[in-house]
């Protein structure tokens, strides 16, 4: 399901990439902007990819006639899967963006990229190298020492063309030969030290079958795919800044139809989570999370399952902006953006997470009174709903304290509280079981209090009619990690030791307002936070609810006390 894309940012909020794009249009360098989002289909997209998606598709939306391509970088068939292709398309659509007819794959261009390789060989700008991968790596040198020329660097173009043809024909085993660009083994830029641009991989490809047993590297395929598609601005994260000279060199030395401009921006890093695809895969494979879409994961599918909204994520990506400086962003900013979005749109219901029975001693036997409450106070047009009120209620255990501490204003023996949308009740009796655990409160209600304002100091608490409440399992999620930055840990420490053992709290005795279970999307339980039904485990008659986000930033408050 797709969602409407956001409006273009206001002019005063232009980032440096948008300024470049606008200047290129003003100067006539380009009549339109053409960008691309080029994921590798070897994993699920995460919130960091959402930033790139919003930037690339956003640029196209902001300029009439412009477009953004979705291109799968499918140059490594051993690690790719159709599952990831489908999930990536679903995620991009869900975020509110559409590539229209501009869906491409790097494999669409394998023939043309191969022709470019032949062109480089014929010009004496690339050569077939017989060094094993480990030796290629060892002879690259260091940041302070030049690399060593391969003994195969002096092969003639004719010999290289013959060997490359035999590589394609499958004569040589995997890893035995590579095609390398002939640039400069003494370059201060390690990426220009005769990089590998083709390697032998006898692995069938999902789209091309057994046609190829040699595949271009990312650097080889990336720039040429951009050029063949007429991309104007090839936007990458900062780790590709050092690759830009190679990007330009490869395009400059063949008959490419155009030369896109590569621009780099800082990638998104969030506190208390991980963005590394390798680490996310480790969590999934070790069973440390409930799959790629675990609501604690930063994957888009995980955020969707948790109840985050596309507009909230887009708002967050716009708010953090686009810069050239790497930094780590507070997870609280993402939660705040989602919270702000949900406050405008989410319907309100009542739910009790840890129920405690309250019996109203003077309530007429069998009487059910419908009470009216707003569906969403932030949206007057949303209307109202009816909540049944009876003499046997469920309240939150936390809303009662037998021996109240200073500053506690909710129910206690002899104390009165206002029931939300309802009446004042007073606790007169406390019923306990044999272990001394409080199992029931009893007391009268004030029938005249329904339409009066609570007295100063009277707390307002939520409740449910015991006879009408529906049992549900509720899952409360918290930070995935206990440390802000999983990379900032002592050497030799297993990063998974920073996983938060309290990141999931499953409450099996919760009860909820029935209407909440028929509400699509994310909703608010008043006083508790925003919740949604779990798309993976919730079943008819056995609802499972996920807490999307609290009503306030309780994590920051808790950390301030540490």
Regions of interest found by a model, annotated:
Residues 1-6:
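N-terminal acidic, proline/glycine-rich, low-complexity intrinsically disordered segments
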Residues 10-22, 26-89, 206-237:
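N-terminal catalytic cores of NTP/NDP-binding nucleotidyl/phosphoryl-transfer enzymes
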Residues 30-31, 97, 126, 173, ...:
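Intrinsically disordered or highly flexible coil/loop and linker segments, enriched in small
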Residues 38-42, 71-79, 101-111, 134, ...:
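Conserved short loop/turn motifs at secondary-structure junctions
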Residues 70, 74-76, 82, 119-279, ...:
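Active-site cores that bind ATP or allylic diphosphates and position pyrophosphate for catalysis
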Residues 84-110, 116-117, 124-127:
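A glycine-rich helix N-cap at a beta->alpha junction
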Residues 258-337:
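Long, charged, mostly alpha-helical binding arms that flank functional sites
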